Amino acid sequence: MTVSAKNIPAPDLVPVRRALISVSDKTGIVDFARSLAAREVALASTGGTAALLARSGIGVMDVSQLTGFPEIMDGRVKTLHPAVHGGLLAIRDDPDHRSAMETHAIKPIDLVVINLYPFEDVRFGGGDYAATVENIDIGGPAMLRAAAKNHAYVAVVTDPADYARVLEALEKNDGALPYRLRQELAAKAYARTAAYDAAISQWFAESLAIAEPEWRSFGGRLAQVMRYGENPHQQAGFYATGEKRPGVATARQVQGKQLSYNNINDTDAAFELVCEFDPKKVAAVAIIKHANPCGVAEGTSLAEAYRKALACDPVSAFGGIVALNRILDAEAAEEIAKIFTEVIIAPDATEEAQAIIATKKNLRLLLTEGVADPRAPGLSAKTVAGGLLVQTRDNGVIDDLDLRVVTRRAPSEKEMANLKFAFRVAKHVKSNAIVYARDLATVGIGAGQMSRVDSARIAARKAEDAAAAAGGQPLTKGSVVASDAFFPFADGLLSAVEAGATAVIQPGGSMRDDEVIKAADEHGIAMVFTGMRHFRH
């Protein structure tokens, strides 16, 4: 039994006799209010909600009748009144509080049903500054916080999904709500207002271009409870921030089992990578395993791109994630369905493609209704012990003007196309990253090594293994190489030379750039500096 600050025990059951309803999302509110009214709960409401309930034949008192004060300033001030907040905050079993209520004719409010102005929708929907500010709710959060604080006597409902739960509890407890439920609803209300305020503060920081605000908050809504996290002994949930960026968080799952923690992490990595390639110009496919690409390719069709991507590392591709930058068609679906695949994510899928995928009942198909802009601003965050590392999203994209040829030999037109392709891929490979590419397809990928030369050697060996399995020569012969960061020594470049590469793209910026350039010239290698690093950890 919890007690108040005045050492007054909180009652287990609180009868609901009076409710205040004020909602922006009116989903289910008419039926919920009608059920309350059937239990002879007195209803008070505001503005559009009151009008809707009245039109639906439900007896309701306008909040101005409760307060004795009209709504003013275009509805900005309507519930910020002692008659409302006194009714929410009063400790019912405190004689002093009861006396104050009697003196000021304040009636207790037992149930508050509120959801907030749709600030997040306006923010991410491209509303202008004035419209976004106008959708910052003031009275709603104030009532939610007041009711949640006084959960000893008041129940607060913020989510239409909880209406049925509340009605079931009222039915079970003869019109009263139990303390545990009031606690849980209060916790949810505070989580909601915290996320709401986080969205507002984040929007202000973005609008004013404040890169490192003094306080930083993040909010999200539970989208899915996971069976477990990265490993079976870890608990996990997936939270959606409300950002409209096409991707795993906003995608529609057409079929397949529930996504796991690792599925979501890998699918996000896959789709972010494939969005580097403009679907209006080229078909592109990425195959991902453990958040690293094991094959990426461009093609004249998705099917061709998939076959080229798969050839890079067919062993690792088994049980992987496949991302496409165009509408999944039947030809590509047939190719993908030939091996075990966990998830396919694409902007859309034809009916024929969906029918093919449907034959693999456990294969998850996600449709995003578009591709993400790789240049779009945003934030990424990582937890560390006792803190958060927050940075802007790596939205750096190289243009031709960024490229600087630093060797005696310049890349050919074909080499340059492959260099730019490989560097796009390297951006999405865990550091240290080395990518061999040929004919606009990866042929060897080295990821996550502490030494860049080891990544170069692993990438070449992977290419050799794939070639040996296919009965051919390693495709690193005549390939190009991309590195996510500079070569600190010439050894990494020499490994690429040994593998048969003819051109290299890297950020540059090492103290030994001259040594690396000299080695490239000695071996007839063309090398391009981008001036942009893409570490990924």
Curated annotation (Swiss-Prot):
Disulfide bonds: none annotated. SMART domains: AICARFT_IMPCHas, MGS. GO terms for cellular component: cytosol. The lineage of its organism: Bacteria, Pseudomonadati, Pseudomonadota, Alphaproteobacteria, Hyphomicrobiales. It catalyses: (6R)-10-formyltetrahydrofolate + 5-amino-1-(5-phospho-beta-D-ribosyl)imidazole-4-carboxamide = 5-formamido-1-(5-phospho-D-ribosyl)imidazole-4-carboxamide + (6S)-5,6,7,8-tetrahydrofolate; IMP + H2O = 5-formamido-1-(5-phospho-D-ribosyl)imidazole-4-carboxamide. Residues 8-158 form the MGS-like domain. The keyword Transferase applies. Its EC number is 2.1.2.3, 3.5.4.10. Pathway: Purine metabolism; IMP biosynthesis via de novo pathway; 5-formamido-1-(5-phospho-D-ribosyl)imidazole-4-carboxamide from 5-amino-1-(5-phospho-D-ribosyl)imidazole-4-carboxamide (10-formyl THF route): step 1/1; Purine metabolism; IMP biosynthesis via de novo pathway; IMP from 5-formamido-1-(5-phospho-D-ribosyl)imidazole-4-carboxamide: step 1/1. This is Bifunctional purine biosynthesis protein PurH. It comes from Chelativorans sp. (strain BNC1). GO terms for molecular function: IMP cyclohydrolase activity; phosphoribosylaminoimidazolecarboxamide formyltransferase activity.
